[in-house]
Amino acid sequence: EATSNFVVGDITVSGGALSDFAAASSTVYTATFTPTADGAATIDVAPSTFTDASGNNNTAATQFNWTYDGTAPTMTITATDGSNAVSDGSTTNDATLTVTFTSSEATSNFVVGDITVSGGALNSFSATSSTVYTATFTPSASGATTIDVAANTFTDAAGNNNTAATQFNWTYDVTVPTISSVSLASDNS
């Protein structure tokens, strides 16, 4: 019903604040809700806060509830050579690495194409959960390799784009050491 005394103060909110309250008509009102942080938010109108033209008090509104998520997901890249961890920036002679990509939030659209590599190739990419993905990295030759996930390549359930992962750097070294010269300091014969 039409009302003329419904005001922004009749609305109770948690988890944010209302602004730009306006009457679009005598029965429709609009406002902008801005969350203060990630988490639960509610908007409510209690009973008997405004009246209709005949002076009848309103009944309680159905509370509007939802959870706000404005945090961008992050991705952590780690590697192992079987059961041993391989540190970022290290040098090894492992023919393959198992690379694990761990998202801070569940995602359903992280795919192998979101990953960039240099010095090798990824295969056997699979999801072990909605936050953990694995792949096998095979270097193409001795030398520096990188594995990276750029910003804005996947989203969380709320639609937030990811931040860039810290690049994983590893050097593959299968060069056999050689001795270039041998000299004797003295001859005892």
Name these PLM-found stretches.
Residues 1-189:
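Non-catalytic beta-sheet/beta-sandwich ligand-binding modules that flank or precede catalytic cores
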